[in-house]
């Protein structure tokens, strides 16, 4: 078979990106841990009443994970009694965030004996306006997680083998680090599940939400941390999954970009940045666009990513898909942006050059873009 850039990229994908041999033991171990933790949480007098299932999200849930599945992201859905009575308001001071007014919820459940534990807890985690407080909710959940791991002896036995567990609060996630036959982490991310009727999106974004039934408000701490914080991050994972579904080579192209980011240690580019870049393209491109090869989509997206990172002649930006007033690159410093821009622009140039003229260096160029185990430096 004559070698061309597409063949070489496909070869690199099979070798570095699609690694399946480790997935079964990792997922089996993860499922055992998830079920044990969830079972302990269900026994809590308050949290047990709020838990309404979970959703595997992130790279693994989106089927975008590259290499070994050593990170799992799990949305833990919390639903309060009379949840539909939560009054949701957009946070005018922080685009993409919402404020949750629990007034009507508390008025109703305050006289219900069976909901007394929840009502008593709510009184401790709202302010005088009955707005839910992110930091107080997270402190409560942190105490539950600490108790859970203490009950488990900070370890779990799976298939006759003991693994040690360490808990750490990481942003909105309550993270368990597992050390044993499988080494991985699980982000348990609390998510207050809200209905479509409670959406506060602008009309254009509401169209893209479509017929999705639910969305979530995530208690994500502010940076720097803020006491009595009423602002929750909006999350539209189900709607995003629907938007990305059925786009033939979209996900393979995302995997290529994530793998390149990983091996080149460009950690300032988050997975959600990449996902957002592609979400915008989903609504801008004709559906047939995604039948192009992963290689062609990848090259074009490298260019669009570099454009959004540029500082000159016009500063680029990456608007949050659900509230474009929020620039997702705004928190990056100029030096961080420049570093990312230079890398992805150079990567785009290299792939475009090799796409038109495969030569003796092409194979090394491609493999070094997706693996650390090659000598060629992009």
From Swiss-Prot:
GO molecular function: 2',3'-cyclic GMP-AMP synthase activity; 3',2'-cyclic GMP-AMP synthase activity; ATP binding; double-stranded RNA binding; GTP binding; metal ion binding
Keyword Magnesium appears in the UniProt entry: yes
Residues bound to Mg(2+): 71, 73, 187
SMART domains: Mab-21
GO biological process: cellular response to virus; cGAS/STING signaling pathway; defense response to virus; immune response involved in response to exogenous dsRNA; innate immune response; response to exogenous dsRNA
Cofactor (UniProt): Mg(2+); Mn(2+)
Regulation: The enzyme activity is specifically activated by double-stranded RNA (dsRNA). Recognizes long dsRNA (>30 bp) with no preference for 5' RNA phosphorylation.
Annotated InterPro entries: Mab-21-like_nuc_Trfase (IPR046903), Mab-21_HhH/H2TH-like (IPR046906), MAB21L/cGLR (IPR024810)
Residues engaged in binding GTP: 187, 233-240
Effect of residue 73 to A: Abolished ability to activate Sting
Effect ascribed to mutating residue 23 to E: Abolished ability to activate Sting
Binding site for ATP: 71-73, 237-240, 258, 271-275
A single cellular component GO annotation: cytosol
Domain of life according to the entry: Eukaryota
EC number: 2.7.7.-
UniProt keyword list: Antiviral defense, ATP-binding, GTP-binding, Immunity, Innate immunity, Magnesium, Manganese, Metal-binding, Nucleotide-binding, Nucleotidyltransferase, RNA-binding, Transferase
Major enzyme class: transferase
Effect annotated for changing residue 241 to E: Abolished ability to activate Sting
Reaction(s) catalysed by this chain's protein: GTP + ATP = 3',2'-cGAMP + 2 diphosphate; GTP + ATP = pppA(2'-5')pG + diphosphate; pppA(2'-5')pG = 3',2'-cGAMP + diphosphate
S-S bridge residues: none
Family affiliation: Belongs to the mab-21 family.
The protein's role, per its UniProt record: Nucleotidyltransferase that catalyzes the formation of cyclic GMP-AMP (3',2'-cGAMP) from ATP and GTP and plays a key role in antiviral innate immunity. Synthesizes 3',2'-cGAMP in a two-step reaction through production of the linear intermediate pppA(2'-5')pG. Acts as a key sensor of double-stranded RNA (dsRNA), the presence of dsRNA in the cytoplasm being a danger signal that triggers the immune responses.
Listed PANTHER family: CELL FATE DETERMINING PROTEIN MAB21-RELATED, CYCLIC GMP-AMP SYNTHASE-LIKE PROTEIN-RELATED
Name listed for the protein in its UniProt record: Cyclic GMP-AMP synthase-like receptor 1
Lineage of producing organism: Eukaryota, Metazoa, Ecdysozoa, Arthropoda, Hexapoda
